[in-house]
């Protein structure tokens, strides 16, 4: 699954990669204003669009389903796996990779990154939550333990 992607970079050879994960009903442009406001140098921003259509409004969602029927997020995880591969192929190291997420994107940042078989530079969840607490406890990776987390 290839996620629709928007990118933004400050210079021609950035050394830091940041994945910006939008919230529920957002899209690949929702987090661009954050990047422009921060004006970080040497950064390439990657803004993926969630793969599922939001059921009750415009926009997209990272998780599809309900508590009653169950949740689908396979397309999301598969798409993020491919995005990490792309970022690596562009020459960015895991030590220079950050993930920032807002609301549902913050949830995804925690749920996904803490399952990775390696650590990254950091996670910045903003106004987020952990939806699947028991699953995360059971499935987190000890190899991701060095990933720094800045809760906002």
Regions found by a protein language model. Name each.
Residues 9, 130-152:
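The feature captures the conserved acid-bearing segment of alpha/beta-hydrolase catalytic domains
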Residues 118-131:
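A conserved short beta-strand
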Residues 100-105, 109:
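Gly/Ala-rich beta-loop-alpha elbow adjacent to hydrolase catalytic centers
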Residues 108-112, 134:
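Hydrolases whose catalytic domains are alpha/beta-hydrolase-1, hotdog thioesterase
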Residues 33, 111-115:
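Active-site signature of alpha/beta-hydrolase-fold catalytic machinery across serine-
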Residues 1-96:
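Serine-hydrolase catalytic machinery in alpha/beta-hydrolase-like enzymes
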């Amino acid at each position: 699954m290839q996620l629709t992607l928007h990118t933004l970079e400050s210079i021609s050879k950035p050394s830091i990669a940041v994945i910006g994960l939008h919230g529920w009903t957002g899209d690949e442009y929702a987090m661009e204003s954050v990047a422009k406001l921060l004006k970080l140098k040497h950064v390439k921003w990657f803004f993926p669009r969630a793969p599922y259509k939001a059921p009750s409004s415009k926009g997209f969602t990272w998780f599809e389903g309900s508590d009653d029927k169950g949740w689908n997020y396979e397309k999301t995880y598969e798409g993020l796996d491919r995005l990490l591969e792309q970022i690596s192929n562009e020459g960015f190291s895991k030590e220079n990779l950050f993930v920032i997420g807002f609301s549902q994107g913050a949830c995804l940042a925690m749920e996904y990154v803490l399952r990775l078989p390696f650590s990254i530079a950091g996670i910045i969840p903003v106004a987020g939550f952990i939806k699947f607490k028991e699953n995360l406890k059971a499935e987190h990776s000890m190899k991701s333990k060095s990933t720094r987390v800045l809760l906002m």
